[in-house]
Amino acid sequence: GKHMGGGNEDYTTAKNALQEVRNQTDKFGLLEDFSEVFSYDNKNNKEIIFAIRNARDEYNMWGDVTYNNNMFPQQNILFGYMDENGNPISSLGDKVKVNGTIRYPVNKDVYTKCFNDNDTRKRSTLQAAYEKKEDGTLSLYGLYPAKFLGTLLDGADTRSPLDDYPVYRYADCLLLLAQAKAFLGEDPVEE
């Protein structure tokens, strides 16, 4: 690239390597449903090129509690709020059996300004918790992750963070290929 004397030769090398991956359509591709890319029940799907694997009874990169503690609210607090349709969050079932201390709350602007309502990634990335006002209207209170929810193991009352962690996705390959083509003055529209 632009560092250490690189240039078109580096971009060409990158483009060729990325095209090799893109051309393996039997092995890699984009999923129709973005939420399925990160689903515990859909590990090693067609969009995943390389991931750090996590499984039950093995050491995992989530440290069993780190991600949950930092990103999720306590279940008893979360259950006091509503979803966007005014239904109690507790009615969402196993999907919200999480516990944490939400040390890193997501800024509400990420949800309201970075995504529009037609963006399918919005509700597949973040879930909103609403407060029901006295007049019956809903007010956005906070957010919690919709990705990397883990799984509910037999006999457990909270989810275990056993999701694989994608390092390279097919979507990354397409974006990098488009960037390499753009640096070479080629048309990246196909990607």
Task: Outline where the language-model segments fall.
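Enriched for extracellular/lumenal, surface-exposed ectodomains of secreted and cell-surface proteins
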Residues: G1, Q24-T25
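Specific register positions within alpha-helical solenoid repeats of the TPR/Sel1-like families, i.e.
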Residues: G1-G5, L175, A182
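Hydrophobic alpha-helical scaffolding
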Residues: M4-G7, Y40
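Elongated scaffold/linker segments in the mid-to-C-terminal portions of large proteins
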Residues: A17-E20, D26-L174, K181-F183
